C-alpha cells in the first residue's frame, strides 16, 4: 500500500518527470564527475551600472567553465532579476551551450519579479539542447531527477534532484519564504525508493539542488557537535513551514548532500544526520547585497563512492574551503590554495 501511495503521489506531482532524460550524463574515464553550482547571480540589465556589474558575472561564468571544465552546471535560483530579462537569460544559457555542457535551472524567489513569469522563463530554459529541465503540467519548470551513468555500465551510479523551493508563502496570515509542497516530498521519496530497489536494495547516492534552505539548516549550523566548514555572515532565511523534505531524504538513505543559495552571505557546509547541508557561494556582483568574495562551488563525485569533494573557486583563482564529505562527516582538505 505504501508503494502504491508513493507512486500515485509521484504521478500526480509531475508527469513531466517520467520522461526520458534529455541528455546523457556519464562519469569520466578517470571515474570522476564535476558539477559547478552558480547561485544568486542576480543578472540585471535595467540600469547601466547594473549591466556593467552583470558583465563581471558573465566573465566569471566564462572563466569557471573554461578552467574547471564541469560536466554539469546547476543554477540554483535568482539568476536574472532585472528587466528586460529574456536577453540576459539567453546570453547566459548561450554561453553554457557553447561549451557543450549540460545544465539545469531551479528558480529562486526573485526570478519572476521582472518582466517574465515563471512559465515564460521555463519556455526559454527548455528551448536549449543542453537543458536538462522539463516543463511541468502548469508550464513551469518541473522537479527533475537526473542520473549519471558509470564509465562503462549504463546503470545509474548517482542521481541528482533539482527541486523548486518556490518563492513566498501562499497562506494568508503566514508571512515568509516558500516551502516544498507535500506532493514534492512524496515524489522525492518515491524516486529514491525506486532507485534503491533497482540498485539491489542499496540506496543510490544522490544530491539535491534548490534555492531556499530547509529549516533544518538553522539548528544544524548552530550544533557544535556537527562537523562543518565555511561561514555565515547573516542568519539563514529558510522556508517558513517544514513539510518534511529533510526527513524524507534521511529516511530513504539516498540523499547525501543538499545545495542551496538565497542567503548571499552564507557559504557553509554542515553535516546533519548523515547529510551534508550546503550552500553555494554568491556568484553575482554588485546588483544586490553581498559581503563575500563572489565565487562558484565545485563538486567532484567519484564513481563507486558515496562521498564527494568540494571547494569554492573565487575570482582570483583561489580554491577555498576545500573539503570532503564522507561517512556523514566533513573533513577539511585545505583552506586556501
Language-model features and meaning:
Residues 69-71, 159-162, 174-267:
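His/acidic metal-ligating clusters that form di-metal
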Residues 20-91, 95:
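N-terminal active-site segment of His-dependent metallophosphoesterases
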Residues 32-45, 157-167, 209, 275-282:
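Active-site-proximal beta-strand elements of phosphoester/diester hydrolases
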Residues 44-46, 81-84, 105-116, 168-171, ...:
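Active-site environment of divalent metal-dependent phosphoester hydrolases
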Residues 23, 29, 145-154, 245-250, ...:
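Binuclear metal-dependent phosphoesterase catalytic core
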Residues 6-15:
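Bacterial N-terminal signal peptides
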